[in-house]
Amino acid sequence: MKRQLYQFIFFRLLGWKIKGTIPNELKKCVMMVMPHTSNYDFFLGLFTRGILNQEMNFVGKKELFIFPFGYYFKSIGGAPIDRSGGKNVVDAIVDIFNSRTVFRLAIAPEGTRKKVTELKTGFYYIALKANVPIVPVAFDYGTKEVRIGNPVKINGDYDSDMNQLLLPHFANVKGRIPENQFND
């Protein structure tokens, strides 16, 4: 019932489409979601998660996951980051990957909704350390499409992987606020 409601709102009322999917057998990955220019992007992600009926996750500091909001955040795929013991964010997230059988982490490499000239690299190193592929996901407001690319197994050469395998997926994609989106 909930899935049909998501489909009705997303496809019929809002006029969006989903191109591609995450293979069901792919239980762990980092989803590189771009461009991130608006708070609406989070809701596009929630609709996509509900329509595809697949576990998709995000992370937040553990303080967000206490009563009364903790249950809600976990129910929509949230996972608390525990940075105790001086652990950095990348290692804390890799620990989450290692502790779960299904974890598809959505991350916006811009790290903000404002204009950036360089992407954050944490998503890449999370995938590398957790030994999981990166799935490029584009939110194209110009065509009203969520485009899910094929999983990419990275090799540790950040520049090569980004320029040859990942960034081409985002060519000609238009964010909700285009002047804020990353352009390489």
PLM regions and their residue ranges:
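Helix-to-loop junction immediately C-terminal to a conserved catalytic motif
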Residues: 3-36
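Non-catalytic C-terminal accessory region of glycerolipid acyltransferases
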Residues: 86-184
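Short glycine/serine/threonine/alanine-rich loop segments
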Residues: 16, 54, 78, 131-132
